[in-house]
């Protein structure tokens, strides 16, 4: 399908709902381009959630109930260099800064063919969850992600377009992923 003929989902978010994973997912209900991400959803996500290791959220099409995308969220803390702290106006002496990590994010291949912006919608929903945590439960300054360049080299551009920047403290220490962060306080002020 021609990318320009795809509908942008960001213009009509009401078409989808975000639901927490409640039971085992059937392998015929979701398929993305990366098999490891399919296997995680089918075989590990529910156990991870039951063990309080990661909460998985499903983006479901309201009309059909089909899973368009999913993300798994976990607690995180990141180290920042002195320059990075200055950039974010952080003068605290804490060794780490509280964050929420998008541990997995995958979009269904069939929905990716029809719509633009599902990944961005998931990042925005993760941001809303982090902001809600800040307002009611615990401090969370950043959303982090380990951009999976092993499976998709262009994923860095996706995260850069969505307001993430590489973490200098972790730069070049990993080869399969690039650690990135997004300042939700800055985003909330926009």
Predicted regions and their residues:
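Non-catalytic substrate-recognition and accessory regions of acyl/acetyltransferase enzymes
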Residues: 1-114, 120-190
């Amino acid at each position: 399908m021609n990318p320009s003929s795809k509908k942008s989902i960001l213009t009509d978010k009401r078409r989808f709902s975000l639901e927490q994973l409640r039971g085992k997912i059937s392998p015929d209900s979701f398929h993305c381009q990366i098999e490891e991400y399919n296997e995680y959803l089918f075989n590990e996500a529910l156990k991870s959630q039951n063990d309080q290791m990661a909460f998985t959220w499903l983006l479901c099409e309201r009309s059909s109930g089909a899973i368009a995308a999913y993300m798994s969220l976990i607690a995180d803390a990141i180290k920042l260099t002195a320059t990075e702290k200055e950039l974010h106006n952080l003068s605290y002496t804490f060794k780490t800064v509280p964050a929420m990590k998008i541990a997995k994010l995958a979009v269904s291949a069939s929905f990716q063919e029809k719509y633009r912006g599902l990944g961005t919608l998931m990042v925005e929903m993760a941001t809303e969850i982090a902001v809600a945590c800040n307002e009611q439960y615990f401090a969370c300054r950043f959303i982090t992600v380990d951009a999976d360049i092993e499976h998709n080299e262009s994923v860095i551009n996706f995260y850069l377009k969505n307001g993430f920047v590489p973490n200098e403290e972790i730069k070049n220490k990993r080869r399969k992923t690039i650690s990135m962060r997004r300042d939700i306080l800055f985003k909330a002020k926009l």
